[in-house]
């Protein structure tokens, strides 16, 4: 599993020109599910995402997590994150989970996040989405299982 997290002052996701998820200050998480991912992977990644310290403390150091700040979390599926780009000029998706498995694991990932954090919004799995954000910093990290 690959989760690209971005610290944002606001973010939203639209499907068919309708906003289906939005947050104020917090994290936008783009999620790519890979073939080898399982429930154990999901649990570890959910914990890491919620506890990863990317927000400034009173001294300006990145020392606070999303759990600490209580900020929003917008989770958007993005299968292209699982692409292998090491060879050639076209991405290979051979390591991406098949759509049915990816949907199931993505839904379980979101459920794990919601069980631990009160403010979780999502996009729509498999939909053509438009994501809007204001990246704060910019602060962006790739979390990998």
Curated annotation (Swiss-Prot):
Record's subcellular location? Cytoplasm
A GO CC annotation recorded here is:
cytoplasm
Q: Which cysteines are joined by disulfide bonds?
A: none
Which enzyme class? Answer: hydrolase
Record's keyword terms, sorted? Cytoplasm, Hydrolase, RNA-binding, tRNA-binding
- What GO MF annotations does this protein's record show? D-tyrosyl-tRNA(Tyr) deacylase activity; Gly-tRNA(Ala) deacylase activity; Ser(Gly)-tRNA(Ala) hydrolase activity; tRNA binding
Motif Gly-cisPro motif, important for rejection of L-amino acids, residue numbers: 137-138
Where does the source fall among the domains of life?
Answer: Bacteria
Pfam families referenced in this protein's UniProt entry, alphabetically: Tyr_Deacylase
Q: What is its EC number?
A: 3.1.1.96
Catalyzed reaction equations: glycyl-tRNA(Ala) + H2O = tRNA(Ala) + glycine + H(+); a D-aminoacyl-tRNA + H2O = a tRNA + a D-alpha-amino acid + H(+)
One GO BP annotation of this record: D-amino acid catabolic process
Q: Which family does it belong to?
A: Belongs to the DTD family.
Recorded domain comment: A Gly-cisPro motif from one monomer fits into the active site of the other monomer to allow specific chiral rejection of L-amino acids.
Read off the PANTHER family from this record. D-AMINOACYL-TRNA DEACYLASE 1, D-TYROSYL-TRNA TYR DEACYLASE
Q: What does this protein do?
A: An aminoacyl-tRNA editing enzyme that deacylates mischarged D-aminoacyl-tRNAs. Also deacylates mischarged glycyl-tRNA(Ala), protecting cells against glycine mischarging by AlaRS. Acts via tRNA-based rather than protein-based catalysis; rejects L-amino acids rather than detecting D-amino acids in the active site. By recycling D-aminoacyl-tRNA to D-amino acids and free tRNA molecules, this enzyme counteracts the toxicity associated with the formation of D-aminoacyl-tRNA entities in vivo and helps enforce protein L-homochirality.
- How does this chain assemble? Homodimer.
Please give the name of this protein.
D-aminoacyl-tRNA deacylase
Q: Which gene encodes it?
A: dtd
